[in-house]
Structure formats: structure tokens, C-alpha cells
């Protein structure tokens, strides 16, 4: 009767060894999925936003994160932008708060 128990223990050890490989495979698979579904798209967005920040020049029409639309009047060295909202209102904002660049003439059409 004891020989059945030895065979059963040997089978359990082999099964655990096979499960550890499948566990490692699953873990690597999930890491790859997270990388390509979450991290990679965010890196692309950050790169596009950085390119937008570097391309801002006086005269560009932009939209901010708070929804303000305005024309860039001046870009400072320390990362701030003087944004002209209308003929009488100008505000200083950080470059990072600019979401997108608008086509020329957008402000006049509103």
C-alpha cells in the first residue's frame, strides 16, 4: 500500500514544477500586456505633448487645459507663456497647461 503513496507524491512534485513554468509565463504575458496597453501609449502622448511645447511661438492660437482659447503673445525662457484671450485680457500660464494648437483664424471665427 505504501508504494501508491510514493507514486502520488512523485506526481504532485511534477505537477508543481509544471505549474511554476506556467505561472512565470502568465506573469511575463501580463507584464507585456500592461506595457503595450498602458505605458507605451502614455509615452507616445508625452512625446507629442513635448513636441507641441517646443513648437509654440508668438502668434499661435492655442487651447489650455481649463478651456481658454487665446493667441500666444510671448514665450519666456522659464517655461511661461503670455496668452492674449481678447483685446484687453492677457494672462501668464505655464507652457505645460497648453493642450493643443488651433488652426489660424479660429479665434476670429468664434
Curated annotation (Swiss-Prot):
Q: Does the keyword Magnesium apply?
A: no
Tell me the gene name: yajC
Q: Where in the cell is it found?
A: Cell inner membrane
Q: How does it sit in the membrane?
A: Single-pass membrane protein
Name the family the entry cites: Belongs to the YajC family.
Q: Output a single Gene Ontology CC term carried by this record.
A: plasma membrane
Q: Which domain of life is it from?
A: Bacteria
The protein's UniProt keywords, in alphabetical order, are: Cell inner membrane, Cell membrane, Membrane, Protein transport, Translocation, Transmembrane, Transmembrane helix, Transport
Q: Does the keyword ATP-binding apply?
A: no
Query: Which SMART domains does its entry note?
Result: YajC (SM01323)
Q: Which GO terms describe its biological process?
A: protein transport
Function field: The SecYEG-SecDF-YajC-YidC holo-translocon (HTL) protein secretase/insertase is a supercomplex required for protein secretion, insertion of proteins into membranes, and assembly of membrane protein complexes. While the SecYEG complex is essential for assembly of a number of proteins and complexes, the SecDF-YajC-YidC subcomplex facilitates these functions.
| UniProt-listed InterPro entries | Preprotein_translocase_YajC
- Quaternary structure and interacting proteins, as annotated: Part of the SecDF-YidC-YajC translocase complex. The SecDF-YidC-YajC translocase forms a supercomplex with SecYEG, called the holo-translocon (HTL).
Query: TM segments?
Result: 20-40
Report the protein name in the record: Sec translocon accessory complex subunit YajC
Q: Name one Pfam family in it.
A: YajC
